[in-house]
Amino acid sequence: MSHIIELPEMLANQIAAGEVIERPASVVKELVENAIDAGSSQIIIEIEEAGLKKVQITDNGHGIAHDEVELALRRHATSKIKNQADLFRIRTLGFRGEALPSIASVSVLTLLTAVDGASHGTKLVARGGEVEEVIPATSPVGTKVCVEDLFFNTPARLKYMKSQQAELSHIIDIVNRLGLAHPEISFSLISDGKEMTRTAGTGQLRQAIAGIYGLVSAKKMIEIENSDLDFEISGFVSLPELTRANRNYISLFINGRYIKNFLLNRAILDGFGSKLMVGRFPLAVIHIHIDPYLADVNVHPTKQEVRISKEKELMTLVSEAIANSLKEQTLIPDALENLAKSTVRNREKVEQTILPLKENTLYYEKTEPSRPSQTEVADYQVELTDEGQDLTLFAKETLDRLTKPAKLHFAERKPANYDQLDHPELDLASIDKAYDKLEREEASSFPELEFFGQMHGTYLFAQGRDGLYIIDQHAAQERVKYEEYRESIGNVDQSQQQLLVPYIFEFPADDALRLKERMPLLEEVGVFLAEYGENQFILREHPIWMAEEEIESGIYEMCDMLLLTKKVSIKKYRAELAIMMSCKRSIKANHRIDDHSARQLLYQLSQCDNPYNCPHGRPVLVHFTKSDMEKMFRRIQENHTSLRELGKY
């Protein structure tokens, strides 16, 4: 019979390390968060062999007093909370007192620290959780923690480490998120002597974004802000033209802590409405400041999952902040820039014959080989080995683009003033709110266009005051019809058109049973089917908005959609129905239209709430400015001075 015993402290720490310290990136995260809590303004992270050989964090924070250094390695010893009430008012990133002892239990840890006003600092060395020495030492104010031979005494953990490149990418990802969370702190990440990431620490979030994503991406991000009595939201989101293939570029922070939250991600997408293409996601860096009492961060070992009170109100604030900022922007993509990116992306490599050329200083100048911009790198498909499949593209972009850090000139640093969330069940009400995006798009200014031609029966050409516009005729009519259907579908108060000859619809037995259950959804959009014999339904009238020639195919399409969905809200059903019908009933490519129809389409487009995107998020029109055209035809050139003018002859 086995007996209950109390585990030795070292074994208990190793068990705790299994939850807190998953990989080298976890060490970096915990130690850097400690440095942030210590009031640091500069943090340097140095790693070797992706952190498995060495992780060293140096900060200029408050430091640790000599008589508290050894205590810091004991479990649940912390300076951040004092009593139970503090657990509900957490303003620091750490609070459990688990990280340092957990790290020390699976590594060789050296800690060098000093506090302001002390005559000397303190050096502590621990191996596998056992303190080997604590001695006075010379040290600047702050703390340096060096973690070596990680997992040396837990070989099973080493067995499951990914490749060094994958582990390094996780570290870059962590540092990037921390840099975005705290733009007032200067972060520097050095791997095997090579600087991988640097932020300026000026307190300007846009500058931190530029240091991580690049200047090109930072320029295409717009500021958002919103607030109520409980929440204050600020940050940046990308314009719809700048997107990524996954959600890894969405960063959410609550009181300076990076979190993952599905519902808030959903709220971000709601704010964009149909301005995003299907399957594409924006870049977003959003800070949320709330009373710590409304957020419970003590629900997960990594503290990345946070329960938020009044989460639905917060979702509404986030989506409104984004929608309001986008409303103020001109969302017509720059055609010349997109063309340049497409050319770079699709260019094929060809074998070139290398001919020896005599270099002439009159015509040639030695230059450094150019590198693709960050935006170009991000748009390439990233191929990973089996060992690196879980690598986030967020970190991969930073890793791949660097040969040396970009040189950015930042303003003089100013101290930033910053303050230090309960998951309800996902119900149909929240889904309804998600689909409000297709019903609240605001009217925008639209250029006056003069139609003058069509190409390949697909694209319309028009001239505006500020250049050339090319319009996708299918996407344009799809947007026009979508807004018509959006307004009319489900308006059961409008008149019904009686049919002289009713339509009979027949379905398989199982489909007929399911349709009977879901018939109220059809009635919500103004379609009333009555049972008529076995597995048959009869339609005696139809809503005015449905053209008579579209009745049979339209009703079957609506029923098919209804049968494919298991649980669906009325708003979702209406939105999807409007999108489906607008797509199927719009003019297709390779279809020529006369000048009158083209001008009428452009007029209808100008009256739309959102004339810039089709319901699937694709652009309706692109814009070449006059300056763009002059650049393409080399009409804009630098001024040249002739040799005669220079007095050479």
UniProtKB/Swiss-Prot annotation:
It comes from Streptococcus pneumoniae (strain Hungary19A-6). One of its GO terms (cellular component) is mismatch repair complex. Gene3D superfamilies: 3.30.230.10, Histidine kinase-like ATPase, C-terminal domain, MutL, C-terminal domain, dimerisation subdomain, MutL, C-terminal domain, regulatory subdomain. GO terms for biological process: mismatch repair. Keywords: DNA damage, DNA repair. Signal peptide: none annotated. One of its GO terms (molecular function) is ATP-dependent DNA damage sensor activity. This protein is involved in the repair of mismatches in DNA. It is required for dam-dependent methyl-directed DNA mismatch repair. May act as a 'molecular matchmaker', a protein that promotes the formation of a stable complex between two or more DNA-binding proteins in an ATP-dependent manner without itself being part of a final effector complex. The gene is mutL. Belongs to the DNA mismatch repair MutL/HexB family. This is DNA mismatch repair protein MutL. HAMAP family: DNA_mis_repair. SMART domains: DNA_mis_repair, MutL_C. It comes from the Bacteria. Pfam families: DNA_mis_repair, HATPase_c_3, MutL_C.
